[in-house]
Amino acid sequence: MQEQIIRRILLHLRFPFSFFLLPVFLFALSTLPDIRPEQTLLLAVLLHLLVYPSSNGFNSLMDRDEGSIGGIERPPPVPIQMYKVSLYMDIAALSLALLYLEKTVVFLLSGYILASRAYSHRRIRLKRRPVIGFLTVSLFQGPAVYAMVVCTNTICIGSAAWWPGLATSFLLVGAGYPLTQVYQHAQDARDGVMTLSRLLGIPGTFLFSGLLFAALGLALGWYAWQLSARPTAAVTALLLLLSPVLLYFLRWAAATRQHPDNADFRHTMRMNLLGSTALNALFLTWSVLNHLPSHVR
């Protein structure tokens, strides 16, 4: 019985799902001229191995989903022990951040955890409200994480130079987030949750995400051309790596117009995996290009 509880807890923490949230972190690194390796690695561990999984587990506990959820096609019941596990993981993350990272990062990390709890908790349930739920996820998984990375590696003084990065990180999350809800309409309706995707409908969700993807493409193109040390190589990498993602999105959107049942768990997870892999590869490539010795450039 104890082993079964542990297996279920580990499953609902959804550690592999952190890969889908990695692009914002890597994007922020790709825009920085200098990096503090030890602090950056610690922040990456705190976010991707403690805070994100803790948020996943708490969300599963509150949702009590019986159908597919992000990363799990057939989720088992969530053990009640998940509440304490998620709490201890958050405490560990904040304690380590308080010891080794900037106070601003601790503040942002605390805000992320509180927003995550407010999003999922049955008594608050921000996810019930389509616009507020969308903004909560997009702002805290996007600009807040971007700011954490910047503040970990530079003097944390807000300036106009931050705005393009904050806006782009918002688009990185906001463009794809409604697509993760398209297969959960019936499940969300039973739970009394009106997500943005339910509000827009399946065709509206693809149109909305398509518009944000277009804005994201323009923002990334501007970054590649204006800020990269090797703009031609950066733009080439952008086109090569993101073209397959665009093609898949367009084909999937067309398929759902013909048969709405194609807005399902498996298509969504493929989109997540393809998009995250391409973006992670792109931002790693940009980081390498921006930190090559000048004689190599």
What are these regions (language model features)?
Residues 20-28, 77, 134-150, 197-205, ...:
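Small-residue-rich segments of transmembrane alpha-helices in multi-pass membrane proteins
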Residues 2, 76-156:
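Intramembrane alpha-helical segments
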Residues 143-156, 215-220, 275-293:
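Hydrophobic alpha-helical transmembrane segments in multi-pass integral membrane proteins
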